[in-house]
């Protein structure tokens, strides 16, 4: 990178030019000499940034995924890849919205310097660490040259989770589960026998009954449906009284989602402008780390419509929001969920007492802490 002047350097350059020009114009030799001296200092500052160091830089995080509050540390290793001794330099390490300035001492050829650093994890977030940059400049801060040595690395600070073993809110069990009243000729829940009709799959002929009655008889089944759980989170800031409600809501979505994936059920998670990744629990939690509210985000009033549009086959729908929407708002949102879908609306209000109200296929629950979630779900399925 080409050396450049800092804001102080540009000010010094302006002062040097003005001093020389005014000194010569007014015949003020002292002012002209001061301007010339300042110009010499600027030239020397630029010369101190000339030359390219050869570094091998390794930015390593002990773990790319941590839970809120867990310790996250990284190691920065800088090796002098040249044969000659390097000059002292300054290393800039951006960490999220902040960063650190590390002093790099003079290194002999092939020598290494290590720095350990800690990353704050008090809040759910995706923390971007890096890129690592070396900075060479003069002691007065007039000029500097910055070189980039690494790509940025993401640290995912996952939301808190609570175990939901035994508390799944599903209504239709996956494959081996609850049968419907729809009849099928090729499913897993046996219903009855009927006369063979041309075109029936001969694999389902019941030969013992056929031999006894003298006519072909085939098996008929009850249709079983594959459970799909749809989770939808409000991202409208007007639905949340404070940040704690949002964090509780995200942790609720994450806990239910992880449990659903562990049970190998189909899952759709709607939060923000798109769907969250649900191929594995870690990927789901990675996306949960980045969830935020934004002006124009989908509020609880639009969650039911969004499920109907993006997950119409869902057998279970869970809508999660803050404490601001009224019970009437929650019921209105649930009315847009496809008919026949078991619907649960959860209101997150830190400090509130748990409550569950069920009417038909709709349940509305309130939880005050994440530890309340298993009890709320048990009341719903009970």
Where are these regions (language model features)?
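Exposed, interaction-prone extracellular/peripheral surfaces
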Residues: 3, 109, 198-382
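Short, acidic/polar linear motifs in exposed loop/turn regions
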Residues: 80-84, 123
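Short acidic, flexible loop segments centered on an aromatic residue
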Residues: 50, 60, 83-99, 209
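Hydrophobic beta-strand positions in extracellular immunoglobulin-like domains
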Residues: 61, 77-78, 119, 134
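Extracellular/lumenal glycan-associated context and N-glycosylation machinery
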Residues: 1-58
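Membrane-cytosol interface motif
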Residues: 59-77
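Short proline/glycine- and polar residue-rich coil/turn motifs
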Residues: 105-113
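Cytoplasm-facing regions of membrane-associated proteins and arrestin-like adaptors
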Residues: 113-230
């Amino acid at each position: 990178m080409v050396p450049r002047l800092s804001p102080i350097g540009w000010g010094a350059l302006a002062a040097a030019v003005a001093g020389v020009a005014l000194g010569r114009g007014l015949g003020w030799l002292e002012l002209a000499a001061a301007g010339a001296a300042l110009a010499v200092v600027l030239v020397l500052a630029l010369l101190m940034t000339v030359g390219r160091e050869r570094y091998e830089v390794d930015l390593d995080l002990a773990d790319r995924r941590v839970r809120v509050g867990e310790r996250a540390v990284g190691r920065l290793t800088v090796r002098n890849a040249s044969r000659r001794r390097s000059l002292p330099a300054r290393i800039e390490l951006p960490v999220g919205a902040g960063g650190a300035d590390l002093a790099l001492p003079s290194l002999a050829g092939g020598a290494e310097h290590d720095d350990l650093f800690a990353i704050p994890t008090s809040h759910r977030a995706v923390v971007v660490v890096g890129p690592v940059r070396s900075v060479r400049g003069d002691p007065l801060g007039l000029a500097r040259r910055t070189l980039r040595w690494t790509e940025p690395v993401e640290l995912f600070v996952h939301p808190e989770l609570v175990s939901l073993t035994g508390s799944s809110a599903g209504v239709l069990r996956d494959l081996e589960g609850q049968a419907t009243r729809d009849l099928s000729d090729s499913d897993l829940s046996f219903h009855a026998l009927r006369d063979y009709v041309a075109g029936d799959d001969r694999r389902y002929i019941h030969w013992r009954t056929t031999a006894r009655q003298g006519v072909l008889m085939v098996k008929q089944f009850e249709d079983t449906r594959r459970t799909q759980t749809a989770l939808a989170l409000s991202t409208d800031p007007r639905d949340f009284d404070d940040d704690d409600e949002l964090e509780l809501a995200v942790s609720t979505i994450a806990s239910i989602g992880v449990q659903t994936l562990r049970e190998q059920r189909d899952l759709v998670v709607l939060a923000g402008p798109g769907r969250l990744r649900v191929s594995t629990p870690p990927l789901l939690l990675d996306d949960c780390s980045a969830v935020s509210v934004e002006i124009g985000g989908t509020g609880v009033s639009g969650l039911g419509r969004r499920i109907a549009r993006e997950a119409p086959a869902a057998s279970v729908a869970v809508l999660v929001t803050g404490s601001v929407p009224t019970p009437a708002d929650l019921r209105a949102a649930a009315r847009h969920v496809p008919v026949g879908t078991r619907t649960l609306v959860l209101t997150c209000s830190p400090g509130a007492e748990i409550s569950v109200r069920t009417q038909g296929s709709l349940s509305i629950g309130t939880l005050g802490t994440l530890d309340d979630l298993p009890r709320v779900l048990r009341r719903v399925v009970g």
